[in-house]
Regions:
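Polytopic transmembrane helical bundles with strong interfacial aromatic enrichment
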Residues: 1-140
Length: 140
């Protein structure tokens, strides 16, 4: 078995939730800007599914990261900074997805402004998490 398998798995899985959370924020934010109902509904529906798929994608990313680090929850140096962003980001994204999935109305309804702000915070956190993960790979 490839000794770097879990590092490769982590690298392969982390990009989906990063992209989908950023995309969800962009879509729902854009949904607030459009006055045409059909356009708004399409954007909010895509934002809904992007968030749910992004949250689902966090699970293999977190599991592969934990296996790769042999269960180290914080670590030292850059790994510690990465994990200090990763754990709250993971919890926030899963919580936001549950909030959206259990919310009233259909998938294409306008989410609350509070929800969109929370997704914006998650987008910033997932970006910071990815940045510090990249710093470990680049080795700076």
């Amino acid at each position: 078995m490839d000794k770097d398998l879990w590092a490769k798995m982590h690298g392969a899985t982390v990009h989906f939730p990063i992209a989908l959370v950023l995309f969800s924020f962009t879509l729902d934010g854009a949904g607030y800007a459009f006055s045409k109902l059909a356009m708004r509904r399409g954007l909010h529906s895509a934002g809904y599914w992007s968030m749910l798929l992004g949250a689902a994608g966090t699970v293999p990313a977190v599991v592969s990261g934990l296996v790769m680090t042999k269960g180290v929850l914080l670590g030292h140096d850059t790994l510690r900074v990465h994990h200090l962003f990763a754990w709250p980001t993971f919890a926030l994204i899963v919580g936001i997805a549950i909030w959206r999935a259990l919310g009233r109305g259909s998938t294409n309804e306008r989410p609350s402004l509070g929800y969109v702000v929370a997704v914006g915070i998650a987008a910033v956190l997932v970006s910071a998490t990815g940045y510090w993960g990249g710093e470990m790979v680049v080795g700076r």
